[in-house]
């Protein structure tokens, strides 16, 4: 098996960091998904069985300030992956949503948005869609966007697989980021891991030629699985952190991650879609 890649993250002074159950850092979190276990698809096959999801259900209330920011900014900057009846959203017109045409990055499982915000600020010419299941994490990102005046981030609340399947066009993405998805360490739960062959194949289809899949995990077993699945996908080929890439792969190190650096190494895994 190829070398997985050691951590190449830059230090960040972004306040805070993801909670232990956020995907924005080594906190073991959702990879993005709706607050339900069912995929909610309209197709007959979807009604016959529930799709296994990669997130853990939980509820969290917003603070008064977060609620005010949510009500003010979410209608413009956010949307849902599914409607109240469970129907998937339509394909996104990203040019209309962002008000411009620019390279597009999808981050699945943005957590509290620490990495999302910092990387978007570093790349103002790239548009970023952050996908997260937890409303509180999205509200924290909205607050950061509001304070920093960032204009190149949009958000989707829901399942990252739904977003890939229904809302993103084939060949439209310059990059996909999956940072610290829930490793589901117990063997009987491995089927819940986000980066399965079917999901990686879907990501590869949505990437444009030369587009980048960037995954990071501090769970050794999950790193091995991600490496094997990515290397087995015929539309992807491994690239190095030092290569000339169309998007930045320098993610910020959150305060939580700095505390965790004495523990397991972080594996950074990158693939490029073949021409």
UniProtKB/Swiss-Prot annotation:
<protein>
    <recommendedName>
        <fullName>tRNA (guanine-N(7)-)-methyltransferase</fullName>
        <ecNumber>2.1.1.33</ecNumber>
    </recommendedName>
</protein>
<feature type="binding site">
    <location>
        <position position="182"/>
    </location>
    <ligand>
        <name>S-adenosyl-L-methionine</name>
    </ligand>
</feature>
<feature type="binding site">
    <location>
        <position position="159"/>
    </location>
    <ligand>
        <name>S-adenosyl-L-methionine</name>
    </ligand>
</feature>
<feature type="binding site">
    <location>
        <begin position="254"/>
        <end position="257"/>
    </location>
    <ligand>
        <name>substrate</name>
    </ligand>
</feature>
<keyword id="KW-0489">Methyltransferase</keyword>
<feature type="active site">
    <location>
        <position position="182"/>
    </location>
</feature>
<dbReference type="GO" id="GO:0008176">
    <property type="term" value="F:tRNA (guanine(46)-N7)-methyltransferase activity"/>
</dbReference>
<feature type="binding site">
    <location>
        <position position="218"/>
    </location>
    <ligand>
        <name>substrate</name>
    </ligand>
</feature>
<feature type="binding site">
    <location>
        <position position="132"/>
    </location>
    <ligand>
        <name>S-adenosyl-L-methionine</name>
    </ligand>
</feature>
<dbReference type="Pfam" id="PF02390">
    <property type="entry name" value="Methyltransf_4"/>
</dbReference>
<dbReference type="GO" id="GO:0043527">
    <property type="term" value="C:tRNA methyltransferase complex"/>
</dbReference>
<feature type="region of interest" description="Disordered">
    <location>
        <begin position="1"/>
        <end position="73"/>
    </location>
</feature>
<keyword id="KW-0808">Transferase</keyword>
<comment type="pathway">
    <text>tRNA modification; N(7)-methylguanine-tRNA biosynthesis.</text>
</comment>
<comment type="function">
    <text>Catalyzes the formation of N(7)-methylguanine at position 46 (m7G46) in tRNA.</text>
</comment>
<keyword id="KW-0949">S-adenosyl-L-methionine</keyword>
<comment type="similarity">
    <text>Belongs to the class I-like SAM-binding methyltransferase superfamily. TrmB family.</text>
</comment>
<feature type="compositionally biased region" description="Basic residues">
    <location>
        <begin position="46"/>
        <end position="59"/>
    </location>
</feature>
<feature type="binding site">
    <location>
        <position position="107"/>
    </location>
    <ligand>
        <name>S-adenosyl-L-methionine</name>
    </ligand>
</feature>
<dbReference type="InterPro" id="IPR003358">
    <property type="entry name" value="tRNA_(Gua-N-7)_MeTrfase_Trmb"/>
</dbReference>
<keyword id="KW-0819">tRNA processing</keyword>
<feature type="binding site">
    <location>
        <position position="186"/>
    </location>
    <ligand>
        <name>substrate</name>
    </ligand>
</feature>
<dbReference type="InterPro" id="IPR055361">
    <property type="entry name" value="tRNA_methyltr_TrmB_bact"/>
</dbReference>
<dbReference type="InterPro" id="IPR029063">
    <property type="entry name" value="SAM-dependent_MTases_sf"/>
</dbReference>
């Amino acid at each position: 098996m190829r070398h997985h890649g050691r951590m190449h993250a830059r230090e960040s002074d972004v306040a805070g960091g993801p909670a232990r159950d956020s995907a924005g850092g080594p906190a073991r979190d959702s990879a993005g998904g709706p607050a339900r276990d069912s995929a909610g698809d309209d197709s007959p096959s979807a009604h016959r069985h529930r799709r296994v999801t990669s997130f853990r259900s939980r509820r969290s209330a917003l603070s008064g300030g977060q609620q005010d920011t949510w009500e003010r900014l979410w209608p413009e900057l956010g949307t849902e992956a599914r409607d109240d009846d469970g129907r998937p959203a339509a394909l996104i017109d990203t040019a209309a949503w962002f008000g411009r045409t620019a390279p597009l990055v999808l981050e699945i499982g943005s957590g509290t948005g620490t990495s999302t915000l910092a990387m978007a600020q570093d790349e103002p010419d790239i548009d970023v869609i952050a996908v997260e299941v937890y409303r509180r994490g999205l509200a924290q990102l909205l607050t950061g966007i509001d304070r920093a005046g960032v204009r190149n981030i949009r958000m989707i609340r829901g399942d990252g697989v739904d977003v890939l399947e229904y809302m993103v066009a084939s060949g439209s993405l310059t990059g996909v980021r999956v940072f610290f998805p829930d490793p589901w360490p117990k063997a009987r739960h491995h089927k819940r891991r986000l980066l399965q062959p079917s999901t990686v194949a879907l990501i590869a289809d949505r990437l444009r030629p030369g587009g980048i899949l960037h995954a990071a995990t501090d769970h050794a077993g999950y790193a091995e699985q991600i490496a094997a699945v990515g290397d087995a996908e015929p539309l992807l080929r491994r690239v190095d952190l030092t290569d000339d890439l169309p998007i930045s792969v320098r993610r910020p190190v959150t305060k939580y991650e700095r505390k965790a650096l004495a523990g397991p190494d972080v594996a950074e895994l990158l693939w490029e879609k073949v021409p």
